[in-house]
């Protein structure tokens, strides 16, 4: 929504002053898959670990390697990898588990000091979460939430198309008696339609102050912390 917390606060203040709706277009927030994941959490027992991953090789990276620096890799534009795609992982973790009590991070940078990939460890009272992101590599691993009785696997954190529940041996699910289940979710071609529907609903109902603003602020504070304190590796 903004490149730092102060910008975000200014935008929120301006929106309220002018009685207009401000909403970050965070795709996972409004996808029905998110509620399905949230509702499945009790089935895997006490949550101990979550690992959300979004590593996508940028189509512009090859041009960067040829010496052509486009906006996607220009550090002056405030679009570091953590802000561009790491935000999907961090925001989803904040939505599900709240703000962490401690944050640790490490990032890699390109020759022009552009932050291109990294990992953010988020410490909670009873669990640890990690956000893994990159604009210069690709990953095929799912994002995972691990509980004492099983795990939830999400194929793409930014736009889920399959959500799988796996329970450990000896912890058969009381709902269907099994230990593996593909949750009944039917993805659409473009899940941006859900954020548009929610935005229209907020506008129609004069929803100037809404819960999503706080999620955006909590997320950008974490990103600010990462960019201010990360250890850069070239």
Regions found by a protein language model. Give the residues of each.
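Beta-strand-loop-alpha-helix segment that lines the small-molecule cofactor/substrate pocket
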Residues: 1-26
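A general structural signal for well-ordered alpha-helical segments in protein cores
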Residues: 8, 34, 89-90, 162, ...
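Basic phosphate/pyrophosphate-binding loop/patch that engages nucleotide-derived ligands
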Residues: 12-21, 35-49, 147, 151
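Predominantly a Rossmann-like dinucleotide-binding segment in NAD(P)-dependent oxidoreductases
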Residues: 28-101, 233
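Contiguous beta-strand/loop segments that form the cofactor/metal-binding neighborhood of enzyme cores
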Residues: 89-161, 196-207
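Short polybasic amphipathic segments
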Residues: 143, 160-175
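Active-site loop of classical SDR/Rossmann-like NAD(P)-dependent oxidoreductases
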Residues: 183-197
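C-terminal helix-rich "cap/oligomerization" subdomain common to oxidoreductases
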Residues: 198-234
